[in-house]
Amino acid sequence: MSVELLDNEDAARAWIGEAFEPTAGQWTQLERFIALLIAESAQQNLIASSTIPTMWVRHIADSAQLLAFDTRDGDGLWLDLGSGAGLPGLVVAILSARAVLLVESRKRRCDFLRSVAADLGLANVEVVEAPLERIDTRPVSTISARAFAPLDKLLDLSARFSTESTRWLLPKGRNALKELALLPQPWQRMFHVEQSRTDAESQILIGSGKITAKQRGKR
């Protein structure tokens, strides 16, 4: 299914306004997040400098589009893997009432995530500084991951957090179908592909359900 491509900053802001109807406070939080992200990127490699002129398209709308695929506002925990710059996790936390768990193993990035959450007053954000393998298992409603790991490894590592009602939201760039085809058939059937709103050549894997080791053995 084709979607309208958000190819400029005005279009990205307009789409966010229409899709999520942010309050004045939420718009302010998004603007503040952008400012903090740009400032911190001069200190550590959070985003490519080439994307700074198009922050609303490349980072804010790119993150917000995942929330549009799971509108269960306030329903269960959102687990964001390899949160890094807080994309999409902090954008989700700003635009929704969802409790968001940001998992990141690098200390400097965790320090940044905590400082932004505090600065923006995001009481619905928890930052966990550890590799995913060392985090206690808990059921989550949504799992997102932006440039975290190859798809098969991502699913192996995060399967224990999934339930029958878990929604998987996984941006995979140009290789979505290729990575999906390498999965066991039971896993493949759990996912479908959606076109990204921010890049004509990028796709998002959308899945539903519980991933199990037993399914992995079925080809």
Where does each model-flagged region fall?
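Conserved beta-strand segments of alpha/beta enzyme cores
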Residues: 99, 124-126, 167, 188-192
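A short glycine-rich, Lys/Arg-flanked "PGG" loop and its adjoining helix->strand segment in the class I
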Residues: 155-168
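Short strand-turn motif at the edge of the Rossmann-like AdoMet-binding core
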Residues: 105, 148, 171-175
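Class I SAM-dependent transferase core
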Residues: 1-79, 108-125
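Conserved SAM/SAH cofactor-binding pocket of Class I
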Residues: 64-145, 155
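Short conserved AdoMet
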Residues: 97, 163, 184
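Short glycine-rich, flexible loops that bind phosphorylated cofactors or substrates
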Residues: 151-152
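Active-site capping/gating segments
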Residues: 175-219
